[in-house]
UniProtKB/Swiss-Prot annotation:
Residues 426-453 are annotated as: Disordered. It comes from Bacillus licheniformis (strain ATCC 14580 / DSM 13 / JCM 2505 / CCUG 7422 / NBRC 12200 / NCIMB 9375 / NCTC 10341 / NRRL NRS-1264 / Gibson 46). The lineage of its organism: Bacteria, Bacillati, Bacillota, Bacilli, Bacillales. It is an enzyme of class 1 (oxidoreductase). It comes from the Bacteria. It catalyses: (S)-4-amino-5-oxopentanoate + tRNA(Glu) + NADP(+) = L-glutamyl-tRNA(Glu) + NADPH + H(+). Homodimer. This is Glutamyl-tRNA reductase.
Amino acid sequence: MHILVVGLDYKSAPVDIREKLTFQPDELGQAMAQLKEEKSILENIIVSTCNRTELYAVVDQLHTGRYYMKMFLANWFGLSKEDISPYLKFYENDGAVEHLFRVSCGLDSMVIGETQILGQVRTSFKLAQEEKTIGTVFNYLFKQAVTVAKRCHAETDIASNAVSVSYAAVELARKIFGDLSDKHVLILGAGKMGELAVQNLHGHGIGQVTVINRTFSKAKELAGRFSGAAKSLNELQCALMEADILISSTGASGYVVTKEMIEHVNKLRKGCPLFMVDIAVPRDLDPALSEVEGVFLYDIDDLEGIVEENLKERQAVAEEVELIIEAEIVSFKQWLNTLGVVPVISALREKALTIQAETMQSIERKLPHLSTREKKLLNKHTKSIINQLLRDPILKVKEFASEADAEEKLALFTQIFDIEEAAFPDGERQDERQPVHAFKRQNPQGLTSIASE
């Protein structure tokens, strides 16, 4: 059993590739359910955001799992494996656990320390629970990932004053225009990204804000909180005629603003420049807009320069988070170690309790005059003897799980107590059931492992 991550992010793929491989929120549950049916996949969770699409899975074989996860991505989005292979990253076992913890803490985000990703990981985790695509390993691992992120936020300053992609978009506007007090900004999309953009603009004394959203009531609610105006999507062209800056972050699957639309609007703008920032993935703004005179178009990847400044400032804090993550990986591995010995411990307990039950039946046959109270006392104390006798062997077998020769020791243990058949009813050997042994064989070099095809 192995843990495997297959995916791409803003570091490995440009936005024109990422937008082709982004799961829509309403199809994520179906995608997880379908991925679970693929060969080798035992458990899975999909995390898909504007900056990453990643498949997390527990697999029975690394090579097979890697192949079928890659093919699943290609088939789902109607692409060939050759189309997506150059952009994919692979994390295995320890490297996969480390990667999940880094992602959840915001350490792997374009904007270091941003907390939005934690909410997105939790949403995917909850959906996987509802779809029943996860089991023991991922239930534990993703709960720990959330706990690790909360610990990092509480014990370090990683989330303090962390900027967002929306903040970076506003900063880009400030770098170009300087003073924003006489500018009219149009926000397209009233979701979290749009809300953060309005918040940042308001903090920098923007002259006027107009919010447009597919659901007008949401646009009105957001605009009202910041003394802005709200318009319906039908009024988009009119709003574009008045705007100096457009920041777009809808969840649309196609372009919301096209080249043809802006060419029509431009005739009425009389040559006034229009600054446009697209922070949506898939993109809201047609890339062909950059060909229109007077239009200055930027997408999410163009914000990297502003984000770099944030990275330098937060590097020292990031190192503190790395130390917490390393300790938490050790903790997870200790828990994972015990999974391999669970059937051994269960078989030992079952055998001991069977002996105790048979002994009680024998006593009751030989001493028929025993009262109900006396039988209960005898039952209680014989079970107590069993528990005390098993305590040290169980502690010892848990210690075996972390040792290099664990397989040999566990085999000897099951022979001594004559429980091999009960512990492994299907004839499975211990190395087939012990995930951490696989971790040690496949990833001997340390904490991080990014595999290549």
